[in-house]
Amino acid sequence: MKIEELIIDGFKSYAVRTVISNWDDQFNAITGLNGSGKSNILDAICFVLGITNMSTVRAQNLQDLIYKRGQAGITRASVTIVFNNRDPASSPIGFENHPQVSVTRQIIMGGTSKYLINGHRALQQNVQNLFQSVQLNINNPNFLIMQGRITKVLNMKATEILSMIEEASGTRMFEERKEKAFRTMQRKEAKVEEINTLLREEIEPRLTKLRTEKKTFLEYQHIYNDLERLSHLCTAYDYYKLSLKVEELTVQASQKHSHIAEMESSLQTSKQEVLILKEKIKKIEDERMRQMSVSSDRTLDSQLQTVNENITRISTSIELKNTALEEEHGDLQQIRGKAKELETLLRGKRKRLDEVLSVYEKRKDEHQSISKDFKSQEELISSLTTGLSTTEGHETGYSRKLHEARDTLNDFKAEKETNRLKLEGLNKQISLTKPKKAEATKRCDQLNREIDILQNHVEKLKMSLKNTNSDITGEDVLQQKLKQLAKDRGNLLNELDALKSKLAYMEFTYTDPTPNFDRSKVKGLVAQLLTLNEENYDKQTALEITAGGRLYNLIVETEKIGAQLLQKGNLKRRVTIIPLNKITSFVASAERVGAAKKISNNKAQLALELIGYDDELLPAMQYVFGSTLVCDTPESAKKVTFHPSVKLKSVTLDGDVYDPSGTLTGGSVNKSAGPLLQIQKLNSLQLKLQVVTSEYEKLETQLKDLKTQNANFHRLEQEIQLKQHELTLLIEQRETDSSFRLLSDYQQYKDDVKDLKQRLPELDRLILQSDQAIKKIERDMQEWKHNKGSKMAELEKEFNQYKHKLDEFTPILEKSENDYNGVKLECEQLEGELQNHQQSLVQGESTTSLIKTEIAELELSLVNEEHNRKKLTELIEIESAKFSGLNKEIDSLSTSMKTFESEINNGELTIQKLNHEFDRLEREKSVAITAINHLEKENDWIDGQKQHFGKQGTIFDFHSQNMRQCREQLHNLKPRFASMRKAINPKVMDMIDGVEKKEAKLRSMIKTIHRDKKKIQDTVKSIDRFKRSALEKTWREVNSSFGEIFDELLPGNSAELQPPENKEFTDGLEIHVKIGSIWKDSLAELSGGQRSLVALALIMSLLKYKPAPMYILDEIDAALDLSHTQNIGRLIKTKFKGSQFIIVSLKEGMFTNANRLFHVRFMDGSSVVQAR
């Protein structure tokens, strides 16, 4: 393949399109003056061949190849070579059927280069492959001999000459491939080392960690399964036990309900018995009253009965209240214990909440920092890629980042300067304040001591106030009661005074006859000492007629007392005295009285039986009333009086007197109230007055005590208020005191200085950090300007790292947030439970206080009622002493009735306790049912499995398992599970699979690399063997041609290539020259022309060994004289007929041997070529 035509347009000195045609296929010469552009023709050929070393064509860059660097209006350079390709044996691969091959290369201002093959666009590599296939490798050109090449050959070392032989033999290509193979081996070794490093430093540690995590994860799964199994088992056991408890409680509640029904039935029977006994007692009492000879006030019995009923009712109420109080105390104790337990749990949960919150806030800050870095990196990449900011109105890319960093740095510097100025001002203030501090401290200490003393005094007063009882409402109630009692007492006194004035004639007064006289031995008038029941009021006239004047006799204990009164008692009126120890009387026998009752059909009674009196007064009463009958009608009086079996004096209700002697006394009788009735009324009023006075005195004492307590309470309150006011004034005085303000300001200055000093190092660190960030951004900006691709890759790598870090940290933050919310919810639930218990505690304490108040009021009422019962009992005992038989029967019945009433009370208490027990069972049942519902709600699986709970042969066979051990295992597993749950990696199974695959892949790559390395090593050995053989062959042929050509150029002389002494030819070759018969030791012994001929001979011998289709020689004869130049021209013409030579020369001896001569001239600023 040889040049037929060369077309140059705009290339170097060829401004216009220049066509150089008719090239000789063997020997072409180019000549012209210096600077005419002849060498530019060779440069144009090299340009098309694809030269990359611009220095070879004497240019720095492609723009230098355009005519006048494009400044003359020509902006494009184009060179086309048309090759003769008619010889298929020397045709490029793929172009055997093309008789001509045209190759064009064009460049345009700006550096764009374009290749055309036969008019079609082609890649540079395709063009290079085309030329290399015909031994025209322009980047390692053995066909190109430019100016200076001869000098370069002369200065070559042995190894460099060997390289020329290698190039000629073609083994250089093998060497290059060998070097390439070695480089490939080195890369593979580096890759192996990289893989080993990756395996050693990343994969294996990560695999070790993941295998540990996998083991932990598998253990975690095992624990989770055990925990779930044990949790289900314990939950099922709790559910099973609760279900059994509900059934048991249902049975117990049913039994309690039945027991209550039985007790109520029994209680009803006892109440019926009480009613029967009351009816019997009433009949006996009626009979007793009927038998009484004298009427008495029945109000005492009714009052006593009322008082007894009140006492029974109050006692029962107190017992019930005490029972309720005990139960309330028990409930309060349980509530306090539960509240204390909840407080302990809540403290632990709050501590746990603080810990979880701290972790959550720390991770939240870390997440925000990572998110901020991620968004910043995303914004940076987006703005650098698109030139637009995602934040409207802001700068883009590094400019925005740099602006923000500088703003941050300025903010820190401004803060530092501000803090420095503040610190100076504060230090100045401290210096001014410090001298006054001692006096101010003394003043403040004095005020603080006074405040402490006053505060302690207030606390003591509050403690005293707390221990002082106060009842303002009770005082008001007592005052109202006293007011009413005073009113009742006044009314009773008025009635008594009025009645006493009417009975003034019955008033008996005397003076003590002797010193220390015992007035209790003077009993009183007969009329004053007897009592008359209300049912016998209609018999008061008959009794007055019966007593007659004796009604106003004075009863004394002995006749001596009577004598003393008569002698020294200063009696105001005449009086008959009845001494109890001396009086004798006639008393009707029981037989005569019985006969009288029988004859009169119970319309006659002994007068003595109708009245009431003390037992000690019996002789006197017998003396007055013991021998007279009181009859309801005159007929009955007449019958009994004159009946032989009776023969007793009788008095009718109208006052008629029948005497057995035969006399009859009667007539008009005053129907108004007689003295007996008035005396009975007087006695009743006196008794009422006594009860009211006793109650009044008792309440007055209570009121006095209560007033004292309330006064103490009010005094303490007022004193506390006064002292509290003094304390407030003293505290205000301290707050407003200049000394206090000075110390407060001084301490504030110190605290501010401390904070500022702590902040300044932090600001220095932040300023340094910001400054480093700014420098880094500036470096990044410079790197971005010079290498956008690699910088963008680095930014994207950092972005992916941030994204990966954010993706990894987000679940961690979510877990921390879930932990925090969970613990917070538990705290809120505990707080709610604690608040409910505290409310229950307050309500319970209020109920307890109310019950205590009610019990105190009931006990007070009980004391009052017992006092009333005592008074009434004393009066009734006096009244009913003489009815001991009936009384005994009544007592017996009353005892039986009290027994039944006690049974009733006990029964009611038992029923109440049973009701409480029933309510407790119902509450426990409700709690158990609630717990069951809660378990069912929290555990959906229960509904489908509960039929198997407790069944033998199932997983819920509780009898075959130790549930205590199961609970202990569950208790031990929970903290371990909780701790492992925080430590395990849930993605470890997927991760370890990926890492193991990666490890296998990398180890497979290592095996592949080692296998490839072995192949390369085998190939290199084979290449070395082939290279040595080919190199030796080439050396010997070139050596032979070298000697022959040198002999032609310089007849009679010889030259050869030999290895250095004691070395092989593969270590290098040296030029040895023989001038005449003498071998020169060095080329330095030769003349300049001889050395040039030696170099030319070597070059020509190399060209002859493996001829290329074309050779380009640029003024290789510059250092030779004319004869030697002619020899070279002749040598080329005769010895190198198969190749096309293109030679630039200025010597006629050279180009006269050429078959085609091209003459180059420089005209009008451009080169012109003429063929000759």
Curated annotation (Swiss-Prot):
UniProt binding sites for ATP: 32-39
Keywords: ATP-binding, Cell cycle, Cell division, Chromosome, Coiled coil, Cytoplasm, DNA condensation, Mitosis, Nucleotide-binding, Nucleus
Keyword Hydrolase carried by entry: no
SMART domains attached to this UniProt entry: SMC_hinge (SM00968)
GO CC terms: chromatin; chromosome, centromeric core domain; condensed chromosome; condensin complex; cytoplasm; euchromatin; kinetochore; nucleolus
GO biological process, one term: mitotic chromosome condensation
Top-level lineage group: Eukaryota
Sections of the chain in a coiled coil: 172-204, 258-507, 676-941
Chief site of localization: nucleus
CDD domains: ABC_SMC2_euk
PANTHER family: STRUCTURAL MAINTENANCE OF CHROMOSOMES PROTEIN 3 (PTHR43977)
Protein name: Structural maintenance of chromosomes protein 2
Organism: Schizosaccharomyces pombe (strain 972 / ATCC 24843) (Fission yeast)
Gene, per the UniProt record: cut14
